A protein has these predicted regions:
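Acidic helix N-cap motif at the loop->helix transition within catalytic regions
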Residues: 18-22, 43-53
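N-proximal low-complexity "stem/linker" segments adjacent to membrane-targeting elements
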Residues: 1-26
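Cell-envelope/extracellular polymer assembly enzymes that use nucleotide-activated donors
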Residues: 6-8, 33, 192
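Acceptor/aglycone-binding surface of glycosyltransferases and processive sugar-polymer synthases
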Residues: 66-87, 92-95, 104-187, 213-228
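Short helix-capping segments at alpha-helix termini
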Residues: 54-61, 89
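A conserved acidic beta->alpha catalytic loop
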Residues: 38-47, 70, 100
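Hydrophobic helical membrane-anchoring modules
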Residues: 1-2, 183-346
Length: 346
């Protein structure tokens, strides 16, 4: 337990026979339950986990193996673990990938904001950790930074970065609100989940943690397939959030600003294409065409910035700043001392 809260860790696995044993063997002492979810791995992942379960005896946390009959994606694997943790009424459920890229020594820093009631969901942020630029492969850093910017707009959590991290912790109350069957099942799962959390006005903490690479993990990313899917997913989830949060549940004029930004943006593209076509055909840039294009482009930018500002202000109260990783403390210590946790007084 962590400060009187039960803690489970979901470990999604796909072809991690060389890595998953290390993850299970280094699980922190305060973890009560480990839910390993095998996503139909064709390698020996299941056998490795079963050997660990047989050999652990009474040492360490309880380990439960859950299996998918077919490969459904990392998001589906995590949601399978979430559903089991929710069924068991576990207070806090964290996620640690089976490839060993998530430092178990930092799990307490991730769990603490949720255990202490400061956040409903906490996620790692590797991009802002000192030295991250030199540790994270350059193409991953830049790609993650771009997707993080797009996720800010789609989700409404403007303070978060490193949107693609899977190192997270969530409260039981948050899990009770979520429709786990509807969550995106594959690589875009963390982005989709943030959008759904925002719909319920749940607080999200961004915890700066050390990035871990080159520990034997094998990347399963396929950029040519992921980029088109992620672009469509973020656009679709953004539009869904606008409809659900600012039209159906409560009206806010920011949807009109976003709509105006989209309309004038499309108009500016049309005028620009016409301008270029006429310049190629005649060698002359029509003055009126250029003026209208400039006006629509400027209007689109202004409408979009106003809409973002409105959205940022509407969601500012969901921002949970975590300045430094707080240490874990034995259950009951806070009650015995009668003191507030460091950094939370007032």
């Amino acid at each position: 337990m962590f400060e009187s809260k039960t803690v489970a860790v979901v470990v999604p696995c796909y072809n991690e026979e060389t890595q998953v044993a290390g993850v299970l063997e280094t699980m922190p002492d305060f973890v009560d339950l480990v839910l390993v979810v095998d996503d139909a791995s064709p390698d020996g992942t299941v056998a490795v986990v079963e050997r660990h379960i047989e050999g652990r005896g009474d040492a360490g946390p309880e380990v439960v193996l859950l299996r998918h009959e077919r490969n459904r994606g990392v998001g589906a694997a995590i949601c399978t673990g979430y559903a089991e943790a929710r069924r068991r009424r576990i207070d806090i459920t964290a996620v640690m990938a089976g490839d060993g890229q998530m430092d178990p020594d930092q799990l307490d820093a991730l769990v603490a904001p949720v255990a202490r009631g400061r956040a409903d969901y906490a996620k790692a942020n590797r991009l802002f950790y000192q030295g991250a630029w030199g540790t994270i492969p350059r193409h991953r850093y830049l790609g993650n930074a771009f997707l993080s910017m797009m996720t800010k707009i789609a989700s409404g959590y403007w303070h978060v970065a490193d949107s693609q991290t899977g190192y997270t912790a969530v409260s039981l109350a948050a899990l009770d609100l979520l429709d786990l069957e509807a969550v995106y099942p594959r690589y875009g799962y963390p982005n989709d989940l943030l959008v759904r959390l925002n719909l319920y006005d749940l607080r999200v903490a961004d915890v700066h943690l050390r990035p871990v690479y080159n520990v034997g993990e094998r990347s399963k990313m396929r950029p040519a397939r992921i980029i088109p899917r992620m672009t469509w997913l973020l656009l679709a989830r953004f539009l869904w959030r606008m409809k659900e949060k600012y039209v159906i549940r409560d009206f806010h004029p920011l949807v009109l600003f976003y709509g105006a930004a989209g309309l004038t943006g499309l108009m500016s593209v049309g005028f620009f294409v016409r301008l270029v076509a006429m310049w190629i055909a005649t060698g002359v840039i029509p003055g009126i065409n250029a003026l209208v294009w400039a006006l629509t482009a400027i209007s689109s930018t202004q409408f979009g910035l106003f809409a973002m500002w409105f959205d940022m202000e509407m969601n500012r109260h969901l921002n949970c700043n975590v300045s430094a990783p707080p240490p874990a403390r034995p259950a009951g210590e806070e009650e015995a001392s009668g003191q507030a946790p460091p950094g939370e007084a007032g």
